[in-house]
Amino acid sequence: MNKSTLTAALTLPALTVACAGVLGSPPARADTVAYLVNVTVRPGYNFANADDALSYGHTVCTDIGSGRSYDDVMGRIKSDFNNPDDYQASYLINQAVNELCPALIWQLRNSAANYRPPQS
């Protein structure tokens, strides 16, 4: 067996496995039920109903998708729910993006990367 045949014999299976992993990955899918359970069971948001909770979550997705800064989204949520707690706001953002618009996870991570909570 010559060198090029050996290289091809070793490279082809590795490329096949790598391509199968990339091409075979299922797309991220929204899970509205998980979102609703997580934000309606958790105290503090007090959505009037499931439609209001979903609408609010989709607004968060729109904000993140349009490039609104993490700081701005956090501030709006804190204001809307009259709650200064960073954890409460970030929980809602994470639930919305992870469950309703998972394709935006990368954008959320980039936006939140340099976020620093305000000093009390």
Question: What does each of the following model-derived ranges do?
Answer:
Residues 20-37:
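C-terminal region of N-terminal signal peptides and the immediate post-cleavage residues
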Residues 35-38, 56-59, 73-76, 92:
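A general alpha-helix detector
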Residues 39-45, 50-51:
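Extracytoplasmic/periplasm-facing segments of secreted or lipoprotein envelope proteins
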